[in-house]
């Protein structure tokens, strides 16, 4: 069915309530209606019969004003238009006296029930429902929180029983406090926040006190009395213990804090771009040597670079520290000296050996100096050539 004028075609509106108390209502209207006329129509056909002044209509996240026409607001390509109906509350909040009297009635009834020793669940539920009534159907979600509900929230807090216990059973020597006022300078949510802050500060203070007591107990510990020895017969001196020779520490050890196998990050991060960069550097170096020298020199330089690289990789260890000894051998040599330290003949023999070593050291000074010059020259040459070759990733030592 097609309509000749657009204004005469009915439009279908789906009215949704935010509090979900009523099902979605489908209403037919016309595009030439204003929002005010639609509100008056809803006050007649909607189940809760809300007044036009209390209605708020929201379409596509926008509040519809009363003077707007539906043809200027609704999208023409949609078949159904979803409109949200929000009703403002006209009920004034309850007075503080009523809430205070209801609280006193609740405390007196709870005192009577505790003194009798038997509680009725059915009556408790009825009292709760009568003390905290449900919101009326015409109210929306944002206006359903009454002062009584916030008061119930405060009394349901875990720390609220401390105040009730202090009010019912005061400490000896003190009078029972007066009834707590129903309304204070702070809101119920602020009171809850202050209670949580106080509990946390009290916990921190108790922890600090306990740690200080444990520290003072450790400092005030009595020293262990020493056994009394006879001055006439002193005990013999015990033999000195051999020095603890610590094993040699490898400075290249890699640690893994995660507890898994040791993995070198440089080996993992060497992608194809890194390899291309390394190969390009080597190619530039070799091209310079090849174009600016003869073929024989190029072969000699290539061979030298390969040998230096293999030596750096650890395939040809040319220089070995022959003077290094195992720590166990030094410990084995130290122990006989400690054992024979009190022998006078052994002391004389060691003095004679020391004189002979002085003469031998004077004769070997020149040899050591000559070896130092050769070692320095070899170190300079190897360092120069190895600096021309790009270094590879360090080998992980487990």
Curated annotation (Swiss-Prot):
Give the UniProt subcellular location, in the record's own words: Membrane
- CDD domains according to UniProt: Ubl_HERP2
Q: Which parts of the chain span the membrane according to its record? A: 298-318
Q: Which Pfam families match?
A: ubiquitin
InterPro entries, alphabetically? HERPUD1/2 (IPR039751), Ubiquitin-like_dom (IPR000626), Ubiquitin-like_domsf (IPR029071)
Q: Where is the composition biased (Pro residues)?
A: 233-245
* Keyword field: Membrane, Transmembrane, Transmembrane helix, Unfolded protein response
- Give positions of region: Disordered: 90-143, 212-247
Which segments constitute the Ubiquitin-like domain?
A: 11-90
- Residue ranges annotated as compositionally biased, kind Low complexity, are 96-125
Recorded coiled-coil stretches? none
| Cellular compartments per GO CC | membrane
Q: What is its main location?
A: membrane
Q: Which cysteines are joined by disulfide bonds?
A: none
Q: How does it sit in the membrane?
A: Single-pass membrane protein
Gene Ontology BP annotations: endoplasmic reticulum unfolded protein response
The UniProt function text for this chain reads:
Could be involved in the unfolded protein response (UPR) pathway.
The protein's name in its UniProt record: Homocysteine-responsive endoplasmic reticulum-resident ubiquitin-like domain member 2 protein
């Amino acid at each position: 069915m097609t309509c000749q004028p657009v204004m005469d075609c009915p439009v279908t509106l789906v009215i949704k309530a935010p509090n979900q108390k009523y099902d979605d209502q489908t209403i037919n209207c016309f595009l030439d209606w204003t929002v005010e006329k639609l509100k008056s129509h809803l006050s007649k056909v909607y189940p809760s019969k809300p007044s036009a002044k209390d209605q708020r209509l929201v379409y596509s996240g926008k509040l519809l004003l009363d003077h707007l026409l539906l043809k200027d607001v609704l999208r023409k390509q949609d078949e159904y238009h979803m409109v949200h109906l929000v009703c403002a509350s006209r009920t004034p909040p309850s007075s503080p006296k009523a809430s205070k009297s209801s609280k006193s009635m609740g405390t007196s009834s709870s005192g009577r029930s505790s003194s009798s020793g038997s509680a009725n669940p059915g009556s408790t539920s009825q009292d709760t429902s009568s003390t905290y009534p449900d919101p009326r159907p015409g109210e929306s979600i944002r206006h359903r929180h009454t002062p009584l509900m916030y008061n119930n929230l405060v009394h349901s807090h875990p720390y609220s029983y401390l105040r009730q216990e202090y009010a019912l059973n005061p400490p000896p020597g003190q009078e029972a406090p007066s009834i707590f006022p129903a309304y204070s300078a702070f809101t119920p949510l602020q009171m809850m926040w202050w209670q949580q802050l106080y509990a946390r500060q009290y916990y921190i203070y108790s922890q600090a006190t306990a740690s200080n007591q444990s520290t003072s107990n450790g400092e005030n510990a009595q020293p262990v009395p020493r056994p009394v020895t006879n001055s006439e017969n002193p005990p013999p001196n015990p033999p000195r213990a051999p020095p603890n020779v610590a094993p040699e520490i490898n400075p290249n050890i890699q640690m893994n804090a995660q507890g898994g196998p040791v993995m070198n990050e440089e080996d993992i991060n060497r992608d194809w771009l890194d390899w291309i960069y390394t190969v390009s550097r080597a190619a530039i170096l070799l091209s310079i040597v090849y174009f600016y020298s003869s073929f024989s020199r190029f072969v000699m330089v290539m061979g030298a670079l390969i040998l230096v690289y293999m030596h750096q990789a650890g395939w040809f260890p040319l220089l070995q520290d022959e003077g290094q000894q195992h720590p166990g051998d030094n410990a084995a040599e130290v122990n006989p000296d400690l054992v024979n330290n009190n022998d006078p003949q052994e002391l004389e023999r060691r003095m004679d050996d020391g004189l002979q070593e002085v003469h031998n050291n004077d004769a070997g000074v020149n040899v050591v100096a000559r070896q130092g010059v050769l070692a320095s020259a070899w170190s300079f040459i190897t360092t120069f050539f190895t600096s021309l070759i790009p270094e590879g990733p360090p080998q992980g030592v487990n």
